[in-house]
């Protein structure tokens, strides 16, 4: 599963809208959409904020890349 799909899946699992997540990590909702759709990738500080807000492990996001 791609990183963007994992972000979307976890966000919806937590019942968060893109706007709510964006407000929590201080980015725009369109940025969240871009991350989820693989259009762009978050900067390191934003990635850390996403990991904390979504309560996920960084290894979960990158496990497909680490095992290949």
Each predicted region: which residue ranges?
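Non-catalytic, surface-exposed connector residues within folded enzymatic/regulatory domains
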Residues: 1, 15, 41-44
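A detector for short, charged/polar N-terminal pre-domain segments
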Residues: 1-2, 66
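Compositionally biased, low-complexity segments enriched in small residues
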Residues: 2, 7-8, 30-33, 55
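Short basic helix-loop element that most often maps to the first helix and adjoining turn
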Residues: 5-24, 49
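Short, charged recognition helix plus adjacent turn
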Residues: 9-10, 34, 60-68
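DNA major-groove recognition helix of helix-turn-helix/homeodomain DNA-binding modules
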Residues: 26, 45-60
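Recognition helix of helix-turn-helix/homeodomain-like DNA-binding domains
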Residues: 26-42
């Amino acid at each position: 599963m791609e990183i963007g799909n994992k972000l979307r899946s976890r966000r919806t699992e937590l019942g968060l809208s893109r706007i709510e997540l964006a407000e929590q990590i201080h980015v725009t909702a369109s940025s969240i959409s871009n991350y989820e759709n693989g259009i762009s990738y978050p900067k390191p500080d934003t990635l850390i904020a996403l990991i904390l807000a979504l309560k996920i492990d960084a290894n979960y996001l990158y496990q497909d890349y680490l095992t290949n």
